[in-house]
């Protein structure tokens, strides 16, 4: 039986708390008192992440932005760009971090796919020692699930070279 209790905090307030965290980059426990308690905000964040709402929201925003920026433009891009970025992370709280020997960074690596207007289409985060081809393939798999029907060219640097990724 579904839970029909009335919410104590509005979803808008929870989203505002998540936007605050994103903008300021602070710890969950340091949320100001104007927002709900951090365990509740974190609960909704993880719940929406698990059911794919963040990805669906991003996809809808990209399509809407492309339509409103230039009405003659299609919802789906034709060209995308794939690249990796190594980022440092804290010593605690991250299980799958590694060392990127090339950039000498201990942390994680994010593979980002953006369109030519720099709008995020797909992302994959893995340990820093993960090969670009492995992370790129995971990011491309996420991109394929989004159904950008016109996308036919993804540009990438030499780190993504090789036959397995091209297929």
Predicted stretch roles:
Residues 1-167:
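Short alpha-helical elements
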